[in-house]
């Protein structure tokens, strides 16, 4: 909504933050690109088929620890998504193989899963340095669940997250980082290290505030690279009231 590369979405539990982010910035962004860019095709099925052939966008799901990206754990994240409905019956489940997320089909008779479209990556923040030499130019959106936690944060965690973000974006300015979180505490290492203390003290429900933060990198002219960061404090209502933008943006 603000055109920011780093986007906090804060609010009470169970108000739809995570659900909307994983749909709009993960599954739907990948699957429905064809609806926007191939509208000249005759029908929805043709659009989807063409979309499958031409997809280049993927998401990255960030977890704090390595054990959280194991298939048995990570698959729970997608358990509330109706894959069959979204894909018009083409797929009925997800599969994770070598830290990659796939649309897939599970056969009730053979009890086997057949992988289909590769749609996203799983990454562990605790080992962000391991990704430094990799290429993730197909990632358009990064999502870090439970960025605010009652548990223990990693040492230098805000710096690790910025390093990971820079590894993926490669100074292209095209990657978006989504940080849905519950406002269970305003004491958070990110708020201090990213200069958000004043913003968090003054922000009110329904507000969206933006600041610029340094990434620690410099451009080819030696000028420090900054990214725009926005914080949305969702209204407290019985239903989701925040807007994170259309999935096609």
Language-model regions, residue ranges each:
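Phosphate/NTP-binding elements of NTP-utilizing enzymes
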Residues: 1-249
């Amino acid at each position: 909504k603000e055109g920011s590369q780093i986007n906090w979405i804060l609010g009470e539990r169970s108000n739809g933050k995570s659900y909307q982010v994983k749909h709009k910035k993960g599954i739907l962004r990948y699957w429905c690109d064809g609806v926007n860019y191939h509208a000249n095709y005759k029908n929805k099925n043709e659009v989807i088929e063409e979309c499958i052939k031409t997809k280049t966008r993927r998401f990255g799901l960030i977890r704090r620890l390595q054990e959280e990206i194991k298939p048995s754990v990570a698959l729970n994240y997608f358990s509330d998504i109706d894959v069959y409905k979204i894909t018009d019956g083409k797929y009925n489940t997800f599969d994770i193989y070598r830290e990659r997320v796939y649309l897939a089909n599970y056969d009730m008779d053979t009890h086997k899963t057949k992988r289909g479209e590769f749609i996203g990556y799983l990454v562990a923040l605790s080992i962000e340095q391991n990704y430094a030499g990799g290429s993730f130019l197909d990632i358009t959106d990064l999502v870090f669940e439970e960025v605010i936690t009652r548990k223990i944060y990693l040492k230098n965690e805000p710096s690790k997250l910025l390093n990971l973000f820079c590894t993926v974006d490669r100074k292209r300015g095209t990657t978006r980082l989504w940080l849905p979180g519950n406002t269970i505490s305003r004491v958070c290492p990110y708020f201090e290290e990213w200069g958000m203390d004043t913003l968090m003290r003054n922000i009110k429900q329904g507000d969206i505030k933006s600041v610029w933060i340094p990434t620690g990198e410099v451009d080819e002219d030696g000028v420090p690279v900054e990214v725009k960061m926005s914080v949305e404090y969702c209204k407290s209502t019985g239903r989701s009231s925040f807007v994170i933008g259309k999935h096609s943006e």
